[in-house]
Amino acid sequence: MERVNNYKLCVALLIISMVMAMAAAQSATNVRSTYHLYNPQNINWDLRAASAFCATWDADKPLAWRQKYGWTAFCGPAGPRGQDSCGRCLRVTNTGTGTQTTVRIVDQCSNGGLDLDVNVFNQLDTNGVGYQQGHLTVNYEFVNCND
């Protein structure tokens, strides 16, 4: 009986460890974030007009869905890639100021981090350091978009 209980305890601890590892894989710290001139307000939040990677799957979503959050391209070190990341949301925090916002992934990038819409970048860059450096250092975590 004691062996069975030890086995169950080991299995439970393994499952808990796996869940914690999966949760950790959905966030990253000290990530480089640049900006892109999507300016969705000027193109009626049209993912096709922006030539966004995720347009294939998300361009026909309701306007309210496309407007709900600022846009970003995602190529961060942790989390899903490609189509699996499309439409997902990130809570992004400027590590220098603590300023946070939620963004929606609409595109891919190749800078190893995030490529935020310029409006989102400016919203996070409350002290101007990102503009001066040409990039921000941010933390991100995948969050529920509440759609």
UniProtKB/Swiss-Prot annotation:
Main localisation: secreted
Induction: By TMV infection.
Keywords in alphabetical order: Cell wall, Disulfide bond, Pathogenesis-related protein, Plant defense, Secreted, Signal
Residue stretches making up the Barwin domain: 26-147
TM annotation in the entry: none
Residues of the signal peptide: 1-25
Disulfide pattern: C54-C86, C75-C109, C89-C145
One of the protein's GO biological processes: defense response to fungus
UniProt protein name: Pathogenesis-related protein PR-4A
Cellular component, GO annotation: extracellular region
GO molecular function, one term: RNA nuclease activity
This protein's record includes keyword Secreted: yes
Superkingdom of source: Eukaryota
Listed Pfam families: Barwin
Classification of source organism: Eukaryota, Viridiplantae, Streptophyta, Embryophyta, Tracheophyta
Compartment(s) where it occurs, according to its Swiss-Prot or TrEMBL record: Secreted, Cell wall
